[in-house]
C-alpha cells in the first residue's frame, strides 16, 4: 500500500479502475511515457514481442513512433485514409494500445496494456498533463509502479532498498488529487457510470 503523498495517487488509480473496468491502473506524468514503459516491459522485461517492427496508423500523435524507437523497436506505418483517426488502436502485434482518444466506462480490453491520456485541451479527462496504463497483468503492474518512480517503492527512500533501475515518470500528487475530484463528472446522479464517445482528431501523416 502506498504511503504519505503517494496515497492520493493510489486513490486516483482506484477510481480509474472502477470506471474503466481495468483491474490495475498506473498513473504517469504523460501518456507518451506510458507507451514507452508498456513497450519496454513487453520487449525487454518479459520478451513477449517476437518482431522488431511495430505497426501503427500513419496519422497519429508524433510521440508514438518516438516511443516505439526509444523502446528498441522499429516503426511500420499503416496507411490511413482521410485526415483523422478515432478512438483506440493497437500497436500491432503487441498487447499495447494507444487509447489517447478513448476514455469511457468499462473500456478495458482484457490481456492488454491500454495507455490513456489526460494531457491537452481535447482529452475527455482534462488534467493539463498526465496519463495512465490500464492492465490486468499483476506482475506488469508491480514493474510499472517501480519503473515510473526511479525504481523505488512507494515509500521514503530512507526505508527503501534499491535493486532496480527506473525513470522519473510518476504523476505529481496534486494532479492525482485533481483527477480524483474530476472523475465524479463521469457518473450520473444515481451513481451509474456515463458513456463517453471516442474522440476523433486530425493528425499529420508521419509516414
Label for each model-derived stretch:
Residues 36-37, 65-66, 142, 177:
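Alpha-helical elements of the RecA-like P-loop NTPase motor core of helicases
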Amino acid at each position: 500500500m502506498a504511503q504519505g503523498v503517494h496515497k492520493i495517487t493510489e486513490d486516483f488509480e482506484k477510481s480509474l479502475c472502477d470506471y474503466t473496468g481495468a483491474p490495475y491502473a498506473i498513473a504517469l506524468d504523460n501518456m507518451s511515457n506510458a507507451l514507452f514503459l508498456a513497450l519496454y516491459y513487453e520487449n525487454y522485461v518479459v520478451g513477449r514481442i517476437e518482431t522488431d517492427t511495430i505497426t501503427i496508423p500513419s496519422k497519429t500523435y508524433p510521440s508514438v513512433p518516438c516511443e516505439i524507437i526509444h523502446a528498441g523497436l522499429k516503426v511500420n506505418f499503416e496507411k490511413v485514409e482521410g485526415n483523422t483517426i478515432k478512438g483506440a488502436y493497437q500497436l500491432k502485434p503487441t498487447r499495447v494500445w494507444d487509447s489517447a482518444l478513448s476514455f469511457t466506462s468499462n473500456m478495458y480490453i482484457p490481456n492488454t496494456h491500454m495507455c490513456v491520456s489526460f494531457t491537452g485541451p481535447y482529452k475527455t479527462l482534462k488534467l493539463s498533463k498526465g496519463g495512465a496504463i490500464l492492465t490486468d497483468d499483476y506482475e506488469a503492474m508491480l514493474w510499472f509502479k517501480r519503473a515510473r518512480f526511479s525504481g523505488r517503492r512507494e515509500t521514503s527512500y530512507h526505508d527503501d532498498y534499491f535493486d532496480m533501475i527506473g525513470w522519473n515518470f510518476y504523476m505529481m500528487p496534486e494532479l492525482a488529487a485533481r483527477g480524483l475530484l474530476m472523475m465524479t463528472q463521469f457518473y450520473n446522479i444515481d451513481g451509474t457510470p456515463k458513456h463517453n464517445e471516442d474522440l476523433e482528431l486530425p493528425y499529420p501523416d508521419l509516414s
